[in-house]
């Protein structure tokens, strides 16, 4: 695998790279429904042992604020709408900003307004230097991309 101007050989190195530098955004959100918003985001943040618990709480609160879900930390994921769940998934990306984002139909089940929010967050990640790769059937999502690759 060749990433960021270096070759990554071997299962362990590739796995570590994916863990540390790749973020995923799925159509079905990939959240744990019977846990809180905080617990779901903290799972992604956990590999960062450098931050104290207080600093991590602050970082999670900031990420939730960025996606319009300030104060949702204690809410159960199963109680949230689809748009809110997708924004939790984006907040999960924001606490450990990835170098690469792989998004599979990230707006597939969302209404227009929530789709626009998700697109804006993906655009912000791209503008911040991340490589964002999106698989989509949505013209709205495709229209916000810098480059297109059609697969038939």
Residue map of PLM features:
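ABC ATPase NBD coupling module
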Residues: 2-23
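Short coil-to-helix segment of the ABC ATPase nucleotide-binding domain corresponding to the Q-loop/switch region
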Residues: 35-44
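Conserved ABC ATPase signature
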Residues: 76-80, 84-86
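Hydrophobic anchor residue at the start of the ABC signature
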Residues: 90
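A short, proline-enriched helix->beta-strand linker immediately N-terminal to the Walker B motif
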Residues: 95-99
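Catalytic Walker B motif of ABC-type/P-loop ATPase nucleotide-binding domains
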Residues: 101-104
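Helix N-cap at the start of a conserved alpha-helix in ABC-type nucleotide-binding domains
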Residues: 112-114
């Amino acid at each position: 695998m060749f990433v960021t101007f270096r070759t990554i050989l071997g299962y362990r190195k590739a796995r570590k790279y994916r863990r540390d530098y790749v973020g995923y955004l799925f159509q079905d959100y990939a959240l744990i429904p019977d846990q809180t918003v905080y617990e779901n985001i903290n799972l992604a943040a956990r590999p960062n042992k450098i931050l104290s618990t207080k600093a991590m709480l602050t970082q999670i609160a900031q990420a939730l604020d960025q996606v319009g879900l300030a104060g949702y930390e204690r809410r159960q994921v199963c109680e949230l709408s689809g748009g809110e769940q997708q924004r939790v998934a984006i907040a999960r990306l924001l606490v450990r900003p990835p170098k690469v984002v792989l998004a599979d139909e990230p707006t597939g089940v969302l209404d227009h307004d929530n789709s626009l929010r998700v697109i804006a967050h993906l655009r912000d990640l791209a503008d911040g230097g991340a490589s964002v790769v999106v698989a989509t059937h949505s013209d709205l999502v495709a229209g916000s991309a810098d480059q297109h690759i059609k697969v038939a």
